[in-house]
Amino acid sequence: MSEHFLVTGGARLTGNVAVTGAKNSVLKLMAAALLAEGTSTITNCPDILDVPLMAEVLRGLGATVELEGDVVRITSPDEPKYDADFAAVRQFRASVCVLGPLVGRCRRAKVALPGGDAIGSRPLDMHQAGLRQLGAECTIEHGCVVAEAKALHGADIHLEFPSVGATENILMAAVLADGVTTIHNAAREPDVVDLCTMLVQMGAEIEGAGTSTLTVTGVSALHPTEHRVIGDRIVAATWGLAAAMTRGDVTVTGVDPEHLQLVLHKLHDAGATVTQSDDGFRVVQYERPKAINVATLPFPGFPTDLQPMAIGLAAIADGTSMITENVFEARFRFVEEMMRLGADARTDGHHAVVRGIRQLSSAPVWSSDIRAGAGLVLAGLVADGVTEVYDVFHIDRGYPLFVENLQSLGAEVERVS
């Protein structure tokens, strides 16, 4: 039997929880270290499985990587390898973010098409199109993205969708291109802003971080730096949603609440009392949550990564909720597992209609990705009896000390091998 969690329902979560660095940021920052010869130091790194996996990818490219507590030191060689290890890259999606730095620094790259979460198609078309506009030839050969450029030049790039990954890869190539690159319809996520901050610290010239238009003036070389990862807004919001679901009282620190304004507004709509500070927020839920309507959108919209938790909240809310998924088409696979727990839910295309019931019922369930796994554990907290959650390695990829943090808040959760 694979490692799984036993989740006993009924506990009201109370207490304080501190979040560490953002998963969606740290992996791109690690890749960015390839852009400069020498040693870059990244602090506030989360203790998640994807960090050592990314370290293996970087080592395969010739870098030296040291992991010590929440600190990662990456020494990039004078001539990095350009062929990313197939076995390492295939394990998780974010590994494709080495594509931009390799094209920028080496003028060529060979990166296996990535693996990761089963939440639907996430093609690399926009990544390739942007790199082509910068002067690279990009093809798919034998399961790999192959890119090569004699020279990189600035370009006026219009993204069809504000893709975080495409924005970041194009950005990391453009910082070492000749001339000015403008990325229109760029992703505005805090993780992209964090990457821009580190790149500027390395000597890049970037304007417009946090807006939909990024202007990059290429430079001849970057230098190493030290950078602190922003707090993980998805992990922080997960704890806030858990407080609302269990009628709890949870204070979350280590995150900028400005990164979560719409989520905190939705928690207020659900009946929670939400107070904010410079370093976090507090969620107190006294009564049964109210139904909410949520539509996932790129930042500053409601994050698609929190859609499973929103469905979990809707499942035990008073009334009928409408959850609309506008980013990843296969994310509603999670609903089938929620129905095992007794949720009254149905899906129709991009929409899920959830009629709240007072309590879910325990059952064995399987997580298909990081956020679905976390959502199922939260659902288990409001189910009667003991819920078994399987394939929890997904959760370990994105949530540091998940079981330990839940236990510190009063949840009865056990990891079983």
Curated annotation (Swiss-Prot):
| EC number(s) per entry | 2.5.1.7
The question of whether Cell division is a record keyword is answered with yes
GO CC list: cytoplasm
EC class (word): transferase
Compartment annotation: Cytoplasm
- Which reactions appear under catalytic activity for this entry? phosphoenolpyruvate + UDP-N-acetyl-alpha-D-glucosamine = UDP-N-acetyl-3-O-(1-carboxyvinyl)-alpha-D-glucosamine + phosphate
By what name is this protein known? UDP-N-acetylglucosamine 1-carboxyvinyltransferase
Q: Which SUPFAM superfamilies match?
A: EPT/RTPC-like
Which gene name does the record give? murA
Annotated PANTHER family: UDP-N-ACETYLGLUCOSAMINE 1-CARBOXYVINYLTRANSFERASE
Family per similarity comment = Belongs to the EPSP synthase family. MurA subfamily.
Q: Which organism is it from?
A: Mycobacteroides abscessus (strain ATCC 19977 / DSM 44196 / CCUG 20993 / CIP 104536 / JCM 13569 / NCTC 13031 / TMC 1543 / L948)
Provide the residue positions that the database annotates as binding phosphoenolpyruvate.
K23, N24
Positions that bind UDP-N-acetyl-alpha-D-glucosamine: R93, D305, V327
